Each structure stands twice: as C-alpha cells, then as structure tokens.
Amino acid sequence: MLKTRIAVFVSGGGTNFEALINAQENGKIPHGEIVLMVSSSKTAYALKRAENHGIKSVVCSKKELGSQERFEEEILKNLEENNIQLIVLAGFMSILSKEFTKKYENRIINIHPSLIPSFCGEGFYGLHVHEAALKKGVKVTGATVHIVNEIPDGGPIIMQKAVYIEENDTPEILQKRVMEQAEWKILPESVELMCSGKVKIENGRTYCNE
C-alpha cells in the first residue's frame, strides 16, 4: 500500500509532532508516513525529536531568509524534493500566504487549541488562547483540527474535542490538559482520516466517510 507522504511544520517544542510520531509508531496512521519535519526555528526542540526518530528535518527561518517570498520558496523546494502530499501544522507560528495555501489546497491541516470559532484568528496562539478562555470565563474549551486556507484558523473543521475548565486553572495548567485530552488525540485521528481519503470538503464543511 502506498502511504501518503507527510510533512509536519513546527516552531517550538514539538509536543504535537511527538504525538504524531507515537501514533505512527503504534500503527494508528496506517495510511500515512511522516517523512519530513520543517522547523521555522533552528533552536526548536522538535529538531531533536526528529533526530531521535530518524525523521528528516530542515530549518526554514523567515528571519534568516529575509522575506515571506524567499521563506516560502525554500519550504516549497523541500516539499517538492520529498514528494510531500499532506502538510500538518503542529504549533507552526508563521502565517502562510494565500498563494502557498492555494498551491496545497485542501492538503494542509492545522491544530488549534480552542473550539473554533472561539478564541481563534490573528493573535490567538499558544498561551494567549488559554489566557483569553480563562479571562472570558468559559466553562468548556478544547481543540480543533481544520483545513488551512488563506484565513487564519478559518478553514473547514475536521475534528473537535471539548475539555472542561476547572476552578483553579492557570493558562499553563489548561494548556497541558487541552494538549493531553484533546490535541494529542484528534490530531493523529485527523491525519489518518486525511491520508485514507475519508475527508470530503463541500461548501466550506467537511464530511468524513467511514
């Protein structure tokens, strides 16, 4: 069976990347294979995770390359050299242009640490999301996996999972619970759905064929 060739994009520690690797090694992504990790930072711990698991990694730094255009050209070169069919944004802090997302239309997915459309879009990333949820006083938060388009966090939703907020939560505690109870579960599941061709996109919505 030919497996879908996956690239995972990261910017930091790579905990979601590690969750994907573990899922792959445990046979939970039978239709896909992670063949490349792209980091936007040369100091990201995710690079060590890739090395530990024998996964090829490259660093594409917008700061070092000097412009969005050169940044995306370098990424595209690596994607094409490795015949990438699916891109997974797993804590990737750089915004991709409309031209880039169009080139890989319906082949880029992202994990976001809230129940979209709450606490998403420009400025909502990392701990900021959980700080906003606690400040608003919502009782339930969670995570969302969605198709990436030109609108930040605006593409069709593939999967969501809710997580209850507890009375003494801090942004850090909530972030950890959302990762453990939601992100690390629905991201590998969504990747497998994409790789197996079960996700159908129609009129801005997704439908999963079992």
What are these regions (language model features)?
Residues M1-E210:
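One-carbon transfer enzymes
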